[in-house]
């Protein structure tokens, strides 16, 4: 398949109000002249980004406000996105995380994570894949997983579980696609410097995090060149290769010590009630 050409084409970006989604939207508009459909919960941030990109990149931008932990919102958003039949690509980036002891994760929090990271992704993917299969149009999707989906991460147990599902789901679905002009890419970055990793619990792990501009640029490269699975960063790829050669129990144990140390330090720095 040929590379994607984004100029004057409509591309959906979920989770576009901050972090990786916001930066991908900026780069798609400024560097590739893509028209954008920005989806997230925070309308004020989406409208601000829309105004910026329409003015600076001279592209068209639509805003769709939706809470992806709510299936009614998801279905209404998909209807809105597909109604004119012009969608060319989609980046499913929205997600929530939790860093802490799994026993302290509230059930409502877990349900929100599951709905946002898994259920909404599958729901949107089902509808968009069906659209491209039925129409035969050229297009592509980039689904954001994580290196936490490749290797279980203690103290992010639920989060890494959701990302492992996304990784396995997308890798399998790639081989069911019948439209020869449509591709699926699963993107598995390590930690990224974003709003999601700005909390105290992540303070000691900041040195491991990739700058968001680099993560966005590599994600768009993987999307445009239709990679099947892509891990950004040479060190991440090399590290992932060697981690696959070592016993899983050993790797998970080492990660557990690093993450627990960061968590304990963060907890110790919090003011006592």
Predicted regions and their residues:
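Conserved glycine-rich Rossmann-like NAD(P)H-binding loop of the short-chain dehydrogenase/reductase
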Residues: 33-49
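Residue(s) in the substrate-gating loop at a strand-loop-helix junction
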Residues: 146
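Substrate-binding pocket helix/loop in short-chain dehydrogenase/reductase
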Residues: 101-102, 106-114
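Conserved glycine-rich cofactor-binding loop
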Residues: 10, 17-18
